[in-house]
Amino acid sequence: MDRLTVDTSELHKPLIKFEFSSLIQFEGEDEETYEPEVEVDLLFKLERVCNGVKECLRSWRYLKEFDVEDPEERDNLELEIEISEPFTVIFCDKNICPGCCEYRMVVEGKDFEGEFEFLRVVKPVLTALIQGYVSCDY
């Protein structure tokens, strides 16, 4: 989705606040059943790569489920859903390796129900605010 490189080699006790924001959009439908369902299940992961070692720092789940049903199980129903909503997460990293590390947000589709006209994550932005102490050698 998005990535950035952070260099903390000149900082003592660095702390990094990450914010990831995006827009999740989908249009799905299910029809000709007495229990139509539309479901989107995504897993967002913040990964850190330092010295070639990849580590998942944190994951967040995005889950939307919509269903209707005919309790008599006689009528075929139709369900159409269109969603466009923000998805934002914040994470603070304080266990930082000295030097340069790459941070990236990735998304993985876990489960889907229904038929989709489209499903996308748009405008992904990963930002970082870094603080720490700088040693003065002069």
Locate predicted features.
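Extracellular jelly-roll beta-sandwich "head" domains, especially the C-terminal globular C1q domain
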Residues: 1-138
